[in-house]
Amino acid sequence: MFIGKKAPAALRKQLWPVFPTYNILGSRNIYVMSHERRKKAAKRKSDKLQQWAEQEEMRLAREKNQQYAKKLKELKQLTRSVASYVRTREARELEAQKIQELSLPSELGKGSEPAGLAAPRSAKIAPFDASAASLSTSAVPLPQSIQDRLGLAVKYLVSKDHQNWSIVLQQLEAAGGFDGLPQKDIRKMVYAIPKDQLRHVFPQIESLLGQAGLAVSPKLLNTYIKSLMLGRTLNDAQIAYIEGIVAKLRQEPGKEGKLGKLSRATYELLIEAYGKNTNVAKMNEVIQEMKELGLQLSPVVYTNVLSTCVYKTRDHQQAVKLFDSMKFLAGSMAPQTREYQDIIVSYVNNDDIEKALDLYQEMLDQKLDFNQNIMVALARGCMSREQLRFKAWDFIFEIYRCGWEPTANTLEYMLYLASKDGDLALARALYQQLNISNALSPRAFSFLFLAYARSNVGKSIEEFQPFAITVHEEGRNFRRNILEKVDLTPTTENPKQAVPYLPKISLSTPQEVLAESSAVMAHALMVNREFVNVESVTTFLNVAARMGSLDDFIDRYEEFTFLDKTGVTETKTVIEPEILESTSVLLAPKEPSPTKSPILAQVTESQKSAFKMPRNTITYLIALKAAAKHKNYIFAQKVWTERGTYRKSAGFRNLPKSEKEKLDFSFASGMVNCLTDMKLLDDALAILVSTEYQFKWTWKELSHLYAAAAEAGYDKVTKTIRGVVKRAQINFEGKIRRKDYKKYVMERGY
């Protein structure tokens, strides 16, 4: 029915609501392409680090002001001291002048005693007794009864650094041994013996005690056990010997007359010994025994267990739990400098420098003492973050500000900081300083090759970034002084110190880097064979992968590594002649490389591959990087085929399951990046899709592939990557789905 304007008003008013009205303007939809969508602004993860860095700068500024005030106060005090010294000196000069003006006796006549020169009344000086003094005075504090019995034998203890206790005990036995000596004096003498000598001379002490009819007390046995525990590690034979001594202690009744019960000190020594042996099960048994006997765990026990978790078993989670327990117990159990040092090292080793810096702030708030190990650990952790890279050297220079003498370990990590930063000139100078000081180690050798691999030599101006140490004036002065004083000329007096550096402070071309690294490796094979291990060979390969040609890398790859086929079932493989010919042409070096040391070729030929290291996942990852850099698909295919054989070997199969999964994921990620660099995006995507539910893929591993696909306009790849990452967040990270959230809201009712 049509309702026109002529219809009655009442009828129109009655029927009008029945018919809805529509807006004649249609809605407009705007479609945005996937690659044009505005990304959500990422939350800045560096805010906390920036805030901490600002607070740290303010703290250092306050410390500088305090130092200036302290220096001003010292200057005023020095001024007063100098004024006092001048007044005293003037008084002395006046007194000396008066003495000079006195007349001599010859001027006053013989037999007359000049007035004022009479001898003052004082005690008579005792005559010198040569028998009471001796040049053979013992430098070791010994009881008087022991010294009297030793007599002239104390000449073997003249210096604290040079003591011959074996001869001293022989002389003591000839003079009557321990007969008639108090047991307290005997214990004091045993405590005075250095631990590195006590472990050898303790059988003589036991013999002397037996001759005197005295029993070996538990305190002496505990001291002997301490001497046996010198060093960072203990092998099974040493543990068995210590357990034999503890078994003797169990046979003697304790204070309560019970057999089998040990003292708290013995239990603590046992825990420390098992920790150095990395035997966590035995440590737990001893701790459980202490609890059953009602012995409360002391801070020493917690410290030993924490140290074992950090340095031996690398169990970071357990270390954190122990540290938190000590903080919860507080009082005498509260963590001190040693415990903070261990937990900071653990956090740094697990790439959590942020938490390590929080603990550093706790130490500042609690006014705890610091040491070099803490400063070195914090410097090492800061170098792993781009935002804190310049802060790393601040912690190193704090060692000098505190007046500490840098240890060899500190110098090694200064070399590491320079290597990580790509400062090859400083790294070579620091390595030479360690070399001249006879403080080289396999770790320092690996750090030097890290410097060669990460060097800024050959980089463009756009890629170059200033060294972290040059940001500080103190750092610039330190670097300049080191480079000016270093002498890189090989010495002929000591072959071990004749490191074959090129005669220049800074290397300028990749060819120079390759040549020098080759010569340094040849020198190590000749005089420091123990330096050539898996870590150093891996970094040696990385130098060629980053700086050299593919032929340079393959030469080192084949010469220094091999595939360990132990446990692999041999299978017969047929290869087409055409493929074999093309592969051999691509992989075989055509002629000797000018960047390879001739001596290295002679050394490797003479030692007949005795230095070769078995290949592992890291070796294959470096090989993939070399193949990707030179766009060589055939070599990359050879690498991942051989890695499949390596997975069947006993060396890989014997690894823990979690470690195998981690290594497989690293290699899969390396394959994706390698294929991405070769512009084979479909192949890279195929690997990603086939392992989607096997590994936890994140943007960290897929950002390179995503950027390459977006640049090429390959929407299929970008869409698939977003889907894989989204599903990984749900499957591995516990992220709730949208439909599950809707269902949850509906069931909850709000």
From Swiss-Prot:
Presence of the UniProt keyword Mitochondrion in the record: yes
GO cellular component: mitochondrion
Gene Ontology annotations of biological process type: mRNA processing; RNA splicing
Residue range covered by the transit peptide: 1-82
Mapped PPR repeat ranges: 263-297, 298-333, 336-370, 371-406
PROSITE patterns the record matches: PPR
Alphabetically ordered keywords of this record: Mitochondrion, mRNA processing, mRNA splicing, Repeat, Transit peptide
Subcellular location: Mitochondrion
GO molecular function, one term: mRNA binding
Signal peptide span: none
Predominant cellular place of this UniProt entry's protein: mitochondrion
Pfam families: PPR
Annotated function: Regulates mitochondrial small subunit maturation by controlling 15S rRNA 5'-end processing. Localizes to the 5' precursor of the 15S rRNA in a position that is subsequently occupied by mS47 in the mature yeast mtSSU. Uses structure and sequence-specific RNA recognition, binding to a single-stranded region of the precursor and specifically recognizing bases -6 to -1. The exchange of Ccm1 for mS47 is coupled to the irreversible removal of precursor rRNA that is accompanied by conformational changes of the mitoribosomal proteins uS5m and mS26.
Subunit: Binds to mitochondrial small subunit 15S rRNA.
Family membership: Belongs to the CCM1 family.
Note from the entry: Involved in mitochondrial-nuclear incompatibility, a major determinant in reproductive isolation between species, through hybrid incompatibility of Ccm1 and its interacting partner 15S rRNA between yeast species.
NCBIfam families: PPR
Protein name as annotated: Mitochondrial 15S rRNA processing factor CCM1
Organism: Clavispora lusitaniae (strain ATCC 42720)
